Every structure is written in C-alpha cells, then in structure tokens.
Amino acid sequence: MIKEVSGDILMSQAQAIAHGVAPNDHFDRGLALSLREEFPAMYKDFRHYCQQFHPQPGAAWIWSGVGGRIINLFTQEPPQTTHSHPGRASIIHVNHALRELVKLIDKEGLESVAISRLATGVGGLDWEEVKPVIYSYLASLLIPVYLYSNFTKGLKAAEK
C-alpha cells in the first residue's frame, strides 16, 4: 500500500530508502548527494559494485550498512566518460527498476520502504509520467510504501 507523504526522506523510519541513480553515478547532486554525505561507505561500495558488475539501466542494487538500507534503482543512462554527468532517465528504465525493486522487497523480506520521486530531478522525467508507474508496481504490495512526493529538508514525514 502506498502512502504519499511530504518531508525529508532521510528522516524516514522505513527499513529501506529507494532512489534513482545511473550506473557509475557520481552522487554529486540532489538526493544522491545527501545519501553520499549521510552514508559515505554506501557510495564507496556503490562505486566498487559498478566497477565489478557493470550494472545496466533498469537494474537495482541494495546496500545494507550501519544506519540503514539504501536501494539504488538504475533509472538513468550511465555517464559517457568517467568525468561526465549521467545521461537522462527513461520511463522504460523506471519500469524495469521498479520490477527489480519488487523482487528485492520480497527477497530481503522488507517490511517498509520509502521511495523518492524517481528520475524527476537529475533524471529529467516529468513527475506526472513517473507517478502512475510507481503506483502500478507498488500499490498492491502488502507493506507500507512511503512515497515522498514533496521534499522538505529537516521535516519528518507523518508516515504512520
């Protein structure tokens, strides 16, 4: 079941936070930057994972560490070079990544997930196009899914 909330996703009480990234993402803007600052080990492990496994857009990778679990949904094209910015997101990649998220939730036995407005910041997609796709994959889940449709830094959302 999805509950739309407003607030700071980093303050979520959900077992995992899901957000959109690109393979080999630099985590230098938006929510990714905040996650990099909050969980520096996650970013280091993410870079290692990308170098070892070369994930493709549409995949998902979960990181578990002290303080939380972060689900990285590969919704964007990778950067063309080591120093360039990631490519744009696509609704096809969002579809595939959400399918992988549902599998991860089941495999990991997660009891709640917070998810950001996927692919609409750096990814460049329109929220009105992405939101129904999120609902199509996650609305039927039997666990709470907190959709952070509006971000307000420092504000704890009313998840319950």
What are these regions (language model features)?
Residues 1-160:
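Macrodomain-like recognition of ADP-ribose-binding/processing modules
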